[in-house]
Structure formats: structure tokens, C-alpha cells
Regions:
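N-terminal beta1-alpha1 ligand-phosphate binding loop
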Residues: 5-33
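Short glycine/proline-centered loop/turn elements that form peptide/ligand docking sites
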Residues: 2-4, 22, 39-41
Length: 201
């Protein structure tokens, strides 16, 4: 019996994920595709004050792609991503310390916010960028719950100071609208569709 071919025909392509995030690595691996991980040098993840909050993640993912695109070989496909949490007009990145993490969670408590992941997919001759937005609602979190989460999970590597797949997501998130995986760190359904477009060009 012949082995079924994967719907994404990447046999002549080399997929590269430019991210040190274990969550993004696991999500991309769930697409059943082979890829290599490239860790980018330190990238300036600031963005212009004039840029709307909803565009920050895509802007930063583009900066990451620019730092690596010149190193690509002809058959390489590079994926870069950045995730931001947006509350109103305020962008919440990764907290600088535990106190900052507690402050962010108090801001998100009892509110609906947006998780926006900007993705750039680049080859030697093309680049396409997009953003995926998910609305997330938190219940009103107690100080005890916030303190327990920060002290136990140390979410300093997560935008908005939380991981939806962790304890705080299980007890605190009341609803989401949009892609769950986008909140975890990578909108894999949209990435799959974009890769199909590139392969079929």
C-alpha cells in the first residue's frame, strides 16, 4: 500500500522557523511537516509610537524576517512571528519582572482583550505578512490567583504575562473568539493555507 502524501508538498523546500519558542515549535510540528529552527540574533522589537497597536505584531515579525532573509537559500521558506496582547490602545509585551506580570494580569482581569500574532513568510524572492486576531475574555481575577500563577509559572516569556494553555487560562478565561492556537503563539491554520499558496505558485 502506497504511503499517503502530505497535502503540503514540501519535498523540494526547506522550512525554517525563526523562533526560540517551544510553543511555536510544537504548534508547527503539529502540521506534520519537517522544519529546522533558527534562532535569530537579538532583534529590536520596538515599533513607532505612531503605529496602531493592532499593527505592532506584524511590524515586528517583518523586522525579524528582514534580519534573516538575506541568508536564505533558494529552496528555503522562512517563518517569523510575534505575538502581542492589546488592551484598548495599549500593547502588552513580555513582562520585565514578576511585579510587571502581576500588573499586566490585573489590567486584563475582568476585561476582553485581543491577542494578535503577526506572521511573515519569506523566500529569497518574496515575502507575505499577515495578522490573526483572537478576542479573549478574562473573569475578574483575585490577587491570590494572580500571585499563585506568577509565582508558580513565571510567565516572563509570554506576551501579556499569561499562557492560555496554563493554569490561569483554565481558571480565568471565560471565552475566546477566534483561533485558540493563535493565543498559544502561532495561527497554524492560516500558516498552512499561506504555505499552500506559496507551494502552488
Amino acid at each position: 500500500m502506497n504511503e499517503m502524501k502530505h497535502p503540503l508538498n514540501l519535498e523540494r523546500k526547506k522550512l525554517l522557523l525563526a523562533s526560540a519558542s517551544p510553543r511555536r515549535k510544537n504548534l508547527l510540528a503539529a502540521l506534520d511537516v519537517d522544519f529546522d529552527v533558527r534562532v535569530l540574533p537579538d532583534i529590536d522589537e520596538t515599533f513607532p509610537d505612531s503605529l496602531p497597536a493592532s499593527e505592532a505584531a506584524e511590524y515586528i515579525s517583518n523586522k525579524k524576517a528582514s534580519a534573516y532573509q538575506h541568508l536564505l537559500a533558494a529552496d528555503d521558506i522562512l517563518i517569523t512571528a510575534d505575538t502581542t496582547v492589546v488592551l484598548g490602545t495599549l500593547v502588552l509585551g513580555k513582562p520585565v519582572d514578576d511585579a510587571d506580570a502581576r500588573h499586566m494580569l490585573r489590567m486584563l482581569s475582568g476585561c476582553v482583550h485581543q491577542v494578535i500574532t503577526g506572521v511573515t513568510i519569506a523566500t529569497t524572492h518574496s515575502r507575505r505578512s499577515f495578522s490573526v486576531i483572537t478576542d479573549v475574555a478574562f473573569k475578574t481575577l483575585s490577587d491570590e490567583e494572580i500571585d499563585y500563577y506568577v509565582d508558580t509559572y513565571h510567565p516572563l516569556d509570554k506576551a501579556g504575562a499569561y499562557g492560555i494553555q496554563e493554569w490561569i487560562g483554565h481558571i480565568g478565561v471565560t471565552s475566546i473568539r477566534g483561533s485558540y492556537f493563535n493565543v498559544v503563539g502561532l495561527p497554524v491554520q492560516r500558516i498552512y493555507e499561506e504555505l499552500r499558496k506559496i507551494i502552488n505558485c
